[in-house]
Amino acid sequence: MSGNSIGQNFVVTTFGESHGVALGCIIDGCPPGLELTEADMQHDLDRRRPGTSRYTTARREPDEVRILSGVFEGKTTGTSIGLLIENTDQRSQDYSNIKDLFRPGHADYTYQQKYGMRDYRGGGRSSARETAMRVAAGAVAKKYLKQVHGIEIYGFMSQLGPICAETIDLDQIEQNAFFFPDASKLEALDEYMRELKKSGDSIGAKISVIATGVPVGLGEPVFDRLDADIAHALMGINAVKGVEIGDGFGVVTQKGSEGRDLMSPQGFESNHAGGVLGGISSGQPIIAHIALKPTSSISVPGQSMTAQGEMAEVVTKGRHDPCVGIRAVPIAEAMLAIVLMDHLLRHRAQNQDVRSHTPVLGMR
């Protein structure tokens, strides 16, 4: 299997399966001298890990990361950083009854057809369990971005099913299990999820992720545009079926006079483009949104077929998230951080000495 790495200068490679011995990743290209301990990654891993809310999977994994290499006396050495998380709460027997059954909406059928075999235990490599290592690697990138360049990244759930955030209070995001920025909707979210769990069904969500302090100039047109790489990284998250940069699909109904981000010596008047113009960062906040589908691992009976081509009823048992978006916020943050880190290093390699006489614009 190829496709396990992302990045050119800051390269993250992950390995491991949902019910395997462990998950791991290798980070190549991290600059030397960055102070780094397991605690720097553990915070984001705890935000993502299962079993922390009654509305996420009951699988209880501590997700304690270990640094295997690339750090000496508390600082990165510039060599490959090896990270490992052991799997400790697998219940593979939950999947024995579906080992020859394709779960609709999952990668079971496509993995079987592509590779001629598959690890049916929790989805194997296709499981979102793998994203724990992306979060760990993203935490390294986030620390460097903030400490060296003043770039901060944060995400939140902007919609769960029919419930949308109408106000954005950043102080609220970490104060509730939904990473929801609108406190007035928390009771409605709680009630909605209670009824959803009773029905045995699942629901989709929309996650927003923002990076502030990004300098002008990141992005390598034409085929390595910054927004293209961001979309690629975010689309690679399990269950993501749509990505928007800036106003996204909202531009369809905009007129040119409405959607352009007017400029003056005092700064930009708006940010419809989401911080990227012509594939290059404009210095405004990078704004992206992702749409996550409802998981197909539900207890509502459905029709499927076996590996032998026979019709069968499927009822997925096991421990699953009724809304995968609840744990997706730190994953989206991590993927945006990895892309920005990679492009910062690429920009430094080629354009570090470039000086423009045009003043740098901010927001009015």
Curated annotation (Swiss-Prot):
Enzyme class (EC, first level): lyase
This enzyme's EC code(s): 4.2.3.5
Pfam family, one: Chorismate_synt
Gene3D superfamilies reported in the protein's UniProt record: Chorismate synthase AroC
Keyword Ribonucleoprotein appears in the UniProt entry: no
CDD domains: Chorismate_synthase
Domain of life: Bacteria
InterPro entries cross-referenced by the UniProt entry: Chorismate_synth, Chorismate_synth_AroC_sf, Chorismate_synthase_CS
Pathway as given in its UniProt record: Metabolic intermediate biosynthesis; chorismate biosynthesis; chorismate from D-erythrose 4-phosphate and phosphoenolpyruvate: step 7/7
Single biological process term from Gene Ontology: amino acid biosynthetic process
Reactions it catalyzes: 5-O-(1-carboxyvinyl)-3-phosphoshikimate = chorismate + phosphate
One GO MF term attached to the UniProt entry: chorismate synthase activity
Keyword annotations from UniProtKB, A to Z: Amino-acid biosynthesis, Aromatic amino acid biosynthesis, FAD, Flavoprotein, FMN, Lyase, NADP
GO CC aspect terms: cytosol
Family the UniProt entry places it in: Belongs to the chorismate synthase family.
Cited function: This reaction introduces a second double bond into the aromatic ring system.
HAMAP family linked to this entry: Chorismate_synth
Subunit structure and binding partners: Homotetramer.
Protein name per the record: Chorismate synthase
Annotated source species: Shewanella baltica (strain OS223)
